Amino acid sequence: LNNAAITAQAFLDQGYRRVAILDVDYHHGNGTQSIFYERSDVLFVSLHGDPAIEFPFFLGYADETGAGAGEGYNLNLPLPAGSDWPVWSAALEQGCQAIDDYQPEVLIVSLGVDTFELDPISRFKLTSPDYLKMGERIRALNLPTLFVMEGGYAVEAIGINAVNVLEGFEQR
């Protein structure tokens, strides 16, 4: 099951007209992209490892922007191995600007903390304090927001990093 996609569709079924999904998991959200690729009622933004060297390999490239009615409503921000907070946060800023421009009524965050520097799967270099800043930036969108937990494989740090996102989000 794709919890972010199910939730987005549930919001639409309840009368919302514009939903944004921000996927910050290390791997591209290929399922979510495929579900909404030809639709304009959901903006999908994904920050992820470069699919030229990372799973899923066949989707997640920057030139995949949507099709048909969905053209322009899919934003992939693939990042190189070794991306740290300055690199990653620049992509987050680009994604947040696209979300702000789209003017959704609600935001769903596919929250993966497998971008952590000690995660055995990831090649990104985010630190635990970076997740506070991530939450703060997402909060600055000033949208009703639902977080859906995704990946994270540095077991001892998953809780710390997920809580840091939420604490950053709740700070005013």
List the predicted regions and their residue ranges.
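A short helix->loop->beta-strand "cap" motif at the edges of active sites that frequently abuts
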Residues: 140-145
